[in-house]
C-alpha cells in the first residue's frame, strides 16, 4: 500500500516536470508530446470494436525482440488485431509504420486515470510485455479486468529491485504475470525462489531476429567503400563482458 502511494505521487508529479524539461530537450519533447496524441490515435482505430492483442516494448532493441513474435502471431491469427506500444521515442519514431501492427502509439504515462482510460478504449484480450517492462498501474488494471499478462524475453538479476529486501512492493508485480518466457536459467531460478513456477527458458528472441537479418541482402555502398574488400566485424550495444570475446 505504501509502495503504491509513493509510486503514484512520483508518477503524478514527474510528467509535468518532463514537459518543462522537454522545452530544452528534443528527445523529451517527443516523449511528452507523442503521448498527448495517444488517445486520439486509439480513438481513430476503434480499438473497442475488436479483440486486440497488445504488445508493449520499451524501445528499438525490445522491438526487435518482439518483432518475430508479432509476425508469427499475425500469420497464425490473421483476423486478430495487433496493438503495439512504445515507451521511448527512439523506438516509436523509427517503427511507427511497422506493417504487422494495426495500431502503434506511445504507452500512456502510468497514472491510474490514464490506465483506466487506455483499457476502456482498448478491448484487449491479452497483453505481452517485453524484457524489463513492469508498470504497476497497468499491471493492476489488467489484473482487475482479468486480462492475462505474459512477459517475454525477460531477464532477471539478483541486484534488481525485485529481489532486494526493500523492493517488496515492486516484487508483488511479478505475481501478476501468467507466464514468463525468460532468457536464461538464472532468471528462472530467481523467479522460482519467489514461488513463481510458470516460467520457461526460451532464450533471447532477438537471436531469431538477427538470424533473419543475416539471411537478407544487407549490402551498403558506404560499407563496401569503408572495408575495401577486407573482412569487417561490427559490434553494437555491447556489454563489457562482450569486449573480452571481441578482442
For each of these PLM feature ranges, what is it?
Residues 241-247:
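Catalytic cores of alpha/beta
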Residues 13, 55, 246:
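A residue-level signal for conserved active-site and pocket-lining positions in enzyme catalytic cores
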Residues 19-216, 234, 238-240:
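Active-site and donor-binding regions of nucleotide-sugar-utilizing enzymes
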Residues 3-21, 25:
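Membrane-interacting alpha-helical segments
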